[in-house]
């Protein structure tokens, strides 16, 4: 099961560590990355 693909399908981006400004964490991606979605 590809968490990274699932993240992108929801319009998110995978980041290492924490999400950048104007993004919020919404789950995980592969290899410990986090799925970040844009506010708004």
Curated annotation (Swiss-Prot):
Cysteines paired by S-S bonds: 7-35, 14-29, 19-36
Q: Which residues carry this modification: Glycine amide?
A: 40
Cellular component GO terms, alphabetical: membrane; microvesicle
From the UniProt record, give one GO term of the biological process aspect: defense response to bacterium
Pfam families, per this entry?
Defensin_beta
The protein's GO terms of the molecular function aspect are: identical protein binding
Q: In which compartments does the protein localize?
A: Secreted; Membrane
The UniProt keyword set, sorted, is: Amidation, Antibiotic, Antimicrobial, Defensin, Disulfide bond, Membrane, Secreted
SUPFAM superfamilies, alphabetized: Defensin-like
Q: What does this protein do?
A: Has antimicrobial activity against the Gram-positive bacteria methicillin-resistant S.aureus ATCC 33591 and L.monocytogenes EGD, the Gram-negative bacterium E.coli ML53p and the yeast C.albicans 820. Has no hemolytic activity towards human erythrocytes.
- Similarity comment: Belongs to the beta-defensin family.
Q: Subunit structure of this entry? A: Monomer. Homodimer.
| The protein, known as | Beta-defensin 1
Q: Which organism is it from?
A: Emys orbicularis (European pond turtle)
